[in-house]
Amino acid sequence: VNAGAFEVIRARIGLLIPSVNVVMETDFRRYLPPGLQAHAHRVYRRSLQSTHESENQVLADSLEAAKALAHTRADVIVFGCTAATILEGAGGDRIIGQRLTDATGIPTVTTATAVVEALRHLNARRVAMLTPYRDEINETEREFLQASGFEVTQATGMQILESLRIPQVGPGQIYRFVRDELKEPCDAVFISCTNFRAWEALPYLEADLGVPVVTSNQASCWAALRLLGESCPVRGGGRLFEEPA
């Protein structure tokens, strides 16, 4: 048997995601360097609408779901839901991550924390935020980013209420939406939502807009790799992965 035919698994990343999410694990498996695996576990979401109520329910049920995910013996966990992990405000995202770490014994980062760390890593101060969401969630995300030290130049959403519609928006549509709706000068563009195919559009947006673009899944992947101490290049990872630590 040729041992070289077997992939050596260096580390596992556990993804804790809402039950409606079909994009995050696909993105991780597409972009993770060889030797790293992603394993997802879903938090059942009783409502198929993207509202504060539905995100609060995901947050409330995340602890028990994380304990199940821990059975994969993941080396790190990502709580992959932007809208849920901002709900406790600036700094609350880290508290959420710590609660999950304490419950599982596995280092955990939330998408909200990953986004803040990514924007700071890029030295972004003025951030344009574009999302699939309605304004109810957009305003909460704006407040979170502003309280985290950023000037949010705009918070523009596609006004999608039904969660199952969000992953149906293709990367070409996302590219055109961001390009057409970006109004004010900014240091970076943040495209929110882990169930949104924004990472696929990222290289084209960075090339055309001339500023770094951060997406929820890209930032989450970057933060997970940092937790693992991995410095492997990520093809298609964008400016975030190119900036030295």
Per-segment meaning from a language model:
Residues L59-T72, Q173-C186:
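Short, well-structured alpha-helical segments in soluble
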Residues D75-G80, A128-L130, C186-C193:
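Periplasmic-binding protein-like
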Residues I160-R165, L209-P233:
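Short, flexible loop segments at boundaries between secondary-structure elements
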Residues Y175-D208, C221:
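Hydrophobic alpha-helical
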Residues A65-T111:
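Glycine/small-residue-rich loop that forms an oxyanion/phosphate-binding "nest" at active or ligand-binding sites
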Residues I96-L161, F241-E242:
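Conserved beta-alpha
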Residues V1-E64, D135-G170:
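N-terminal glycine-rich anion-binding loop in soluble enzyme alpha/beta folds
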Residues D61-L63, I106-N123, A219-E230:
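Hydrophobic alpha-helical segments within soluble ligand-binding/sensing domains
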